[in-house]
Regions:
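Hydrophobic transmembrane alpha-helices of multi-pass small-molecule transport proteins
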Residues: 51, 121-143, 198
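Specific transmembrane alpha-helical segments of multi-pass solute transporters/efflux pumps
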Residues: 18, 22-23, 52-102, 138, ...
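Glycine-/small-residue-enriched transmembrane alpha-helix faces in small-molecule transporters
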Residues: 1-42, 149-176, 197-200
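Specific alpha-helical transmembrane segments that line the substrate/conduction pathway
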Residues: 38-49, 77, 86-126, 163
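Juxtamembrane C-cap of transmembrane helices in multi-pass membrane transport proteins
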Residues: 18-33, 46, 84-93, 101, ...
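Membrane-interface helix termini and inter-helical loops of multi-pass transporters
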Residues: 24-33, 91, 140-153, 203-223
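Transmembrane alpha-helical segments that form core, pore/gating elements
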Residues: 51, 109-110, 115, 148-209
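Small-residue-rich packing faces within the transmembrane alpha-helices of Major Facilitator Superfamily
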Residues: 20-21, 45-49, 133, 192-196
Length: 227
């Protein structure tokens, strides 16, 4: 294996590790320290500041009005919709369920791409979709049978599925413009729209967030910073 392939595999492993830790860490602060809506708003605002700051140093790119609308819908589905459903799922289900159901994202992308972009679905792809969907349904039914609060667990798992679907829609509808603009340009506009969309529910919950109050501590702040 070449050096570049080793670096590529290492980057993928590091990315999966970072995202894998994100869910259990978020579970420890939601909702005790911050509500799902406030968490989403804080994440969007922080990312907006970061990407617009980086954008000041990057080459300028003009974004067309039609593409701005595509970015807006991408922000609505992929960032606000996916993140709100993810944060609310933390209230009801386990990090393990969230992570396993999230593995269905490639399958959801394939189905939505077939509907929106008319991409062909082969027999192998269809078989993969059925296997993946069966696994997610098995998790939902098993967790409902094991847990005493089955209704809450059902809600959490369904929110996970909403997270998968909204994020898949985001990936599909933003695919064409991702080839025309740099990642920095797309992210700075997408997070800006996301911050504006998440502002009303997020700002109303923010004053009650204990993570920013006197009860907070550096360890909790560190967890929030990681997320």
């Amino acid at each position: 294996m070449t050096k570049d392939k080793w670096l590529g595999h290492g980057a993928i492993l590091a990315t999966n590790l970072i995202f894998g830790l994100n869910t259990p860490i978020a579970k420890t602060i939601v909702p005790e320290w911050i509500s799902p809506y406030a968490l989403t708003f804080v994440r969007m605002v922080f990312a907006t500041l970061v990407f617009w700051g980086i954008g000041l140093l990057a080459p300028k790119e003009e974004v067309g009005k039609r593409d701005l609308w595509t970015i807006f819908w991408g922000a609505l589905f992929g960032l606000v919709g996916a993140q709100v459903s993810f944060a609310n799922a933390l209230l009801y289900t386990s990090p393990v369920n969230i992570t396993i159901i999230a593995a269905m994202t490639p399958l959801a992308v394939m189905l939505i791409a077939a509907l929106i972009l008319k991409e062909p679905v082969t027999f192998k792809k269809a078989a993969g979709v059925l296997i993946g969907a069966s696994g997610a349904l098995l998790i939902i039914f098993q967790s409902s049978a094991i847990n005493t609060d089955s209704s809450g667990n059902w809600i959490g798992n369904l929110l996970c599925i909403v997270n998968v679907i909204t994020y898949a829609i985001y990936l599909v509808i933003t695919r064409p413009i991702s080839q025309r603009y740099s990642a920095i340009t797309l992210m700075k506009w997408m997070f800006l729209f996301s911050a504006l969309i998440s502002f009303p529910p997020g700002i109303s919950d923010l004053p009650e967030a204990k993570v920013f109050g006197t009860e907070s501590n550096p360890f909790v702040i560190l967890k929030l910073s990681y997320i």
